[in-house]
Amino acid sequence: MYGIEYTTILISLTSITLLNYILKSITRMMDYIIYRFLLIAVILATMINAQNYGVNLPITGSMDTAYANSTQNEPFWTSTLCLYYPVEASNEMADTEWKDTLSQLFLTKGWPTGSVYFKEYTDIAAFSVEPQLYCDYNLVLMKYDSTQELDMSELADLILNEWLCNPMDITLYYYQQTDEANKWISMGSSCTVQVCPLNTQTLGIGCLITNPDTFETVATPEKLVITDVVDGVNHKLNVTTATCTIRNCEKLGPRENVAVIQVGGANILDITADPTTTPQTERMMRINWKKWWQVFYTVVDYVNQIIQTMSKRSRSLNSSAFYYRV
């Protein structure tokens, strides 16, 4: 009887000892595998350059900062630059080779030949109807004219911002603007815009909805009109739809691949609609020269500093899409 008990105890001790030995062996083996794997990983990491797949976000600045002219060290091999100028510039310079000359000068600033495009427009009114901004970076030169100051301000507001627009059926519906970013943009060869505000009973306030002659005229006749009315109030509209298209638009934010360079004038135009805010000057700058050769020389000299205030975008601005984001 006692022999059986001793045998059982001996077997138990032997099993415990054997199990302990097996566990220690497994532990040493796992440590060996882990340490060896880590050693190999460290060695490979020092020999292989890992690729970082992060996004390189552009940094934009403000033109309130004074910029010095300099040559950009890194060429813009993969970027395109569009320079928009009025026809009077080419007429004044009267040089058939002026574009080639400027292309060679842009080359000294890191812009390869063929990456800079020169786009001519007739005047501010004509450019307002068909502003096509297709390049990675777009610089628009606008000659200051006191008689066209408001047209210049509206055009700058249009091209310096992104707008999400929807069609308006003014024959069937009343419309209201919901907030300050909500505007009605009219564009065409001749736009006359009249509005009649309505009360809660849809009766005209100071006007008759059945008689457009009693409507208030907010624009006549213009090629580009950005209409701002009292928010939260329904309006009946009358627009010369035969020569003009009107859309209900929401300002989404700045279009950072566009900059406007005002040529002449005492001050930079204020393109803000809100009279209580500080005038917007970012990507809106001024060159104070009389001759167009001097204007273009200055643009070439400072082009890379101007580009630093902008961000490269893949979207284009095309009036046929009426400023939809694409």
Swiss-Prot record:
Disulfide bonds join C82-C135, C165-C249, C191-C244, C196-C207. Residues 1-50 form the signal peptide. Its main location: virion. Residues 165-167 are annotated as: CNP motif. InterPro entries: VP7, VP7_1, VP7_2. Keywords: Calcium, Capsid protein, Disulfide bond, Glycoprotein, Host endoplasmic reticulum, Host-virus interaction, Metal-binding, Outer capsid protein, Signal, T=13 icosahedral capsid protein, Virion. GO terms for cellular component: host cell endoplasmic reticulum lumen; T=13 icosahedral viral capsid; viral outer capsid. Residues 253-255 are annotated as: GPR motif. It comes from the Viruses. N-glycosylated. The N-terminus is blocked possibly by pyroglutamic acid. Ca(2+) 1 binds at D95, G206, T214, E216. Pfam families: VP7 (PF00434). One of its GO terms (molecular function) is metal ion binding. Glycans are attached at N69, N238, N318. It is found in: Virion; Host endoplasmic reticulum lumen. Ca(2+) 2 binds at Q177, D228, V229, D231, D301. Belongs to the rotavirus VP7 family. HAMAP family: Rota_VP7, Rota_VP7_A. Homotrimer; disulfide-linked. 2 Ca(2+) ions bound at each subunit interface in the trimer hold the trimer together. Interacts with the intermediate capsid protein VP6. Interacts with the outer capsid protein VP5*. Some rotavirus strains are neuraminidase-sensitive and require sialic acid to attach to the cell surface. Some rotavirus strains are integrin-dependent. Some rotavirus strains depend on ganglioside for their entry into the host cell. Hsp70 also seems to be involved in the entry of some strains. In group A rotaviruses, VP7 defines the G serotype. This is Outer capsid glycoprotein VP7. It comes from Rotavirus A (isolate RVA/Cow/United States/VMRI/1988/G6P[5]) (RV-A).
